[in-house]
Amino acid sequence: METTIMVVAMDRLTYYKLTSRYLYYFCLDRLLSCHRLDLDRDRKINWRHPKYWNYNNIPKGEKPYLRHIDLWDYRGNFKDWIIENLRSIYCSPYYFESPRYELEYPAIDYNYWDWVIDIDFKGNFKKSKEIAKEVREIFKDYGVKDIHIKFSGSKGFHIWINARYLPNEILNKGYVEGSTILTNFLNFKLRKLLDFVGKEGDTGIDLSIYKENMTVTAPFSLYYADIEGKTPISIPFPINKVEKFKPIYLQNVKPYFIRKLTKYYENFGEIRGDLTDFVDDALRYYQATKKVNNDIKIDLEINTNKKAKPKVEHSKREYIKTTIGDKEVVLNKVKLESYLNELINSNWEDGKMRGCYYLTSLCKLLGYGRDKTIKLLNRWASKYGNKYIKHIDYEVRYLYDRNGKVCSIKWLKENIPEAKTQIEIYKKYYELDKNNYLVKK
């Protein structure tokens, strides 16, 4: 049977019919803002008003606050609501901390956030593409590939990395400080690679988005303003094609092309690789530049063809501070890591889903990234056939994607010989200094 593709002129209604599903799932549990059709398009309406409302009955001109409860309960009407009311939609890189069903005014969790890199070199699109290319190469040096990038809608790009790929060590610094630490280090490396900026020059990466209550253009949203009579689309595309990328406009794009892109980018923000090494280098650079610890001397001179190799002259940090349940504890990282490796390499199993939960918890306590955790757990589970595959997937999604709580303090005391001593004795005689190192009280 012959299939015919009907090519129709694309307009705002047709476009949002094709993309509203992806907008809905991506924006779920995030702070949102928009440009409404019934208002001046240059006037941005922020959805932060505490008044409860649902979008089926919004007084015209009112400044509403879109809560995640509304997105969840009214998802059946979400497409119609976008089509009838919106020109463009913006979302935050950070998430609400309360569950979707929570009816109280939801708080924002600034310790669980996506890293967004905003590239825009003074309106110079050619330079912005060159910057994006160098960022791609920097990440490739760290073994990170398949990064998602999207057109910002103006003269730049947004590189987007989901929170589940960031180690807890950087997430816990909060959205503002954590994003700034990572981006400052990225800027440092770019200054050595770009010919058109000096050592202290502008690299074209905007740090102004790292503020509380900040939102950026959502993937697949239309841009809020026309450029030369055309409406840009904030469309995702493969980062390896950034050199040849040309802005995509609503007026000259075909529906089948949009369908192809939306199908490919259902999981926008995912990466292939482990960011742990990059984050470690960024934190060392942060410590050196802020002079937090005078004992740390770091050489971060960069060879333009090779990854920077920091030389740290202090001894390896052996202790980690974490929260287990409602208690703050200090654990010996070396011993904990040794214990985890013993479990992974041994024939230990409890025959239940609980065992996967414990192992995943230990990986998260040690600050392992999502990919590294999955690799370790699969190595452990390979000894038992396919028995634990589904369990591993569930626990990783719970602890990393949903930022769930790690295993109880009781289990640690009973199963890790060092844990009881550390929790009861170390807390009594030691404390962490401002650099997060263990010192005597």
From Swiss-Prot:
At the top level, the lineage of the source is: Archaea
Keyword terms of this UniProt record: Plasmid
Q: From the Swiss-Prot or TrEMBL record, give the protein name.
A: Uncharacterized protein MJECS07
